[in-house]
Swiss-Prot record:
Miscellaneous section: Heme 1 (or BL or b562) is low-potential and absorbs at about 562 nm, and heme 2 (or BH or b566) is high-potential and absorbs at about 566 nm.
The keyword Electron transport is assigned to this record: yes
Protein name (record): Cytochrome b
Main location per the UniProt record: mitochondrion
Cofactor note (record): Binds 2 heme b groups non-covalently.
Length: 380
């Protein structure tokens, strides 16, 4: 068997990626989230496939078909809520995975980091089009508001929006194409994941110390396969707890009302994992400025390798930048909270301050802290 896994053309690839892969001996539990994201993607594709067997992408029957899945299909409610809450678990793992990358300086693995940003954007697009499919009130109005943002693009904006809608408003054509996008995008994500892993295995994993670990590597199996299985069991336990006890805790009650173009909900807001970006969008009074800020809130991640001037890898021995990092995390949580609040004082002011802080910490404060820490090193 050993010879076969090392020589067989297909098994050889799996062997080099998951069995004999040389891995730093000191990587912590924060490195588990890559494999957890893989499990989340598998759960989403499998549950999504079964949902697609019963779902109809027509404005007259979409809401009814989701109700039918929950009421009449064997374990349909379980599949539907596993898919909905699986998306939340996916984004929790994604945010922690990106946060770990920032903390330990993994962004210096340029190709892996940039593919990761593309993966994040693709996953956000997939989640957005997926949220439209149940055709509830928040699905319809969320689709209307977010797609309408493209009208801020000079000259081509209005034409672009109507092209995406397939008409002059969000309607049957929009729902059909969003279902098509939602079906194909997870497979594109899977392909991007393979590219992400390909680039990662070219350089090898980063580690908590930030030092070169070539002299101290161990095989991925059995050490990290066992560690990952523990993470997977914990993830599935939390997911099942959510699905079986609090299936709607992360959803919006408005989405249990069928879509009505004549009745606008009091507060239009996206799913919780987009609220930080939504708060940044709302904090700028100008439409085009808001759209650019929304895009930059994600694309700014690409600036980390460019803005890094530290002589050390990661933040483990950098107390000033470490403090800024945790302020940044707290600020992100504040933005998430603000995104779900109505547009009124004091929420608008808090949102504007937090949005400015979000960009200033990354672009100004962290590079300045790096320079200060570099100078302190001279005196040690």
């Amino acid at each position: 068997m050993t010879i076969m896994r090392k020589n067989h053309p297909l098994l050889k690839i799996i062997n080099h990626s998951f069995i004999d892969l040389p891995t730093p001996s000191n990587i912590s539990a924060w490195w588990n989230f890559g494999s957890l994201l893989g499990i989340c993607l598998m759960v989403q594709i499998i549950t999504g496939l079964f949902l697609a067997m019963h779902y109809t992408s027509d404005t007259t029957t979409a809401f009814s078909s989701v109700t039918h899945i929950c009421r009449d299909v064997n374990y349909g409610w379980l599949i539907r809520y596993a898919h909905a809450n699986g998306a939340s678990m996916f984004f929790i793992c994604l945010f922690i995975h990106v946060g770990r990358g920032i903390y330990y300086g993994s962004y210096m693995l340029n190709e892996t980091w940039n593919i990761g940003i593309i993966l994040l954007l693709t996953t956000m697009a997939t989640a957005f089009v997926g949220y439209v499919l149940p055709w509830g009130q928040m699905s319809f109005w969320g689709a209307t508001v977010i797609t309408n943002l493209l009208s801020a693009i000079p000259y081509i904006g209005t034409t672009l929006v109507e092209w995406i809608w397939g008409g002059f408003s969000v309607d049957k054509a929009t729902l059909t194409r969003f279902f098509a996008f939602h079906f194909i995008l997870p497979f594109i994500i899977t392909a991007l994941v393979l590219v992400h892993l390909l680039f990662l295995h070219e350089t090898g994993s980063n580690n908590p110390s930030g030092l070169n670990s070539d002299s101290d590597k161990i095989p991925f199996h059995p050490y990290y396969t066992i560690k990952d299985i523990l993470g997977v069991l914990l993830l599935l336990m939390v997911l099942m707890f959510l699905v079986l006890f609090f299936p709607d805790v992360l959803g919006d009650p408005d989405n249990y009302t069928p879509a009505n173009p004549l009745n606008t909900p009091a507060h239009i807001k996206p799913e919780w994992y987009f609220l930080f970006a939504y708060a940044i969008l709302r904090s700028i009074p100008n439409k085009l400025g808001g759209v650019l800020a929304l895009l930059l809130s994600i694309l700014i991640l690409a600036a980390f390798p460019l803005l890094n001037s530290s002589k050390q890898h990661g933040l483990i021995y950098r107390p000033i930048t470490q403090t800024l990092y945790w302020i940044f995390v707290a600020n992100l949580l504040i933005l998430t909270w603000i995104g779900g609040q109505p547009v009124e004082y004091p929420f608008t002011t808090i949102g504007q301050i937090s949005s400015i802080m979000y960009f200033m910490i990354i672009v100004i404060f962290m590079p300045m802290a790096s320079m200060v820490e570099n100078n302190i090193l001279k005196f040690i």
